[in-house]
């Protein structure tokens, strides 16, 4: 994970707030490389070990409902780059056309298998592919949709100096987000 030169950052990231965080990160280049190497090999090993479980989940999803096994959506990662996030599909096909972007509580679009997969957070397993590709990390900020990233303050844009993460401090502290919101 090599840090770009500040001058090479996207124009919307060149501000004093981002520069402050950039200055800290540029002194941690070796740590960033180690983090990327760890992410790659850990994701690869986990993908190999967990592939039988992932195959079973894929079969369960396919048997329960029509549609693809994977849910793919465009998200934003390091330097504002777009990528397609992979997750196991836990909702009915075309659920994003049938309701809100945010899923809360007992959303009727969630399938029975999907509900169980979500409770165990197994829907995130395909993101190991995103980690291997370098689009995500194990720990990082939430991979957001472009609509929300466009609303970022200058300081929030500093989160785009690093790849999005499968997990983050916020996702650990607010594990039951829908319970907090409701």
What would you call each of these model-derived segments?
Residues 1-20, 130-182:
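Hydrophobic structural segments characteristic of membrane proteins
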Residues 115-134:
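Short, conserved beta-strand/loop elements in beta-sheet-dominated catalytic cores
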Residues 3-6, 14-17, 22-95:
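A hydrophobic, helix-centered structural microdomain
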Residues 18-33, 105-109, 124, 140, ...:
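Juxtamembrane loop-helix boundary motifs flanking transmembrane segments in multi-pass membrane proteins
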């Amino acid at each position: 994970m090599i840090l770009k030169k500040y001058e090479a950052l996207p124009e919307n990231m060149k501000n004093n707030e981002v520069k402050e965080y950039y200055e800290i990160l540029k002194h941690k280049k070796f740590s960033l490389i180690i983090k990327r190497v760890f992410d790659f090999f850990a994701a690869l090993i986990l993908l190999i070990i967990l592939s039988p479980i992932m195959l079973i989940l894929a079969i369960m999803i396919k048997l329960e409902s029509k549609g693809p096994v994977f849910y793919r959506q465009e998200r934003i990662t390091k330097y504002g780059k777009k990528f397609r996030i992979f997750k196991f599909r836990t909702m009915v096909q075309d659920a994003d056309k049938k309701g809100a972007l945010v899923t809360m509580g007992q959303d009727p679009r969630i399938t029975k298998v999907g509900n169980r997969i979500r409770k165990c957070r197994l829907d995130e397993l395909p993101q190991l592919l995103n980690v291997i590709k370098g689009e995500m990390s194990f720990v990082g900020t939430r991979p957001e949709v472009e609509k929300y990233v466009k609303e970022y303050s200058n300081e929030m844009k500093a989160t785009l100096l690093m790849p999005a993460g499968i997990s983050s401090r916020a996702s650990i502290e607010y594990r039951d987000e829908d319970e907090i919101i409701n």
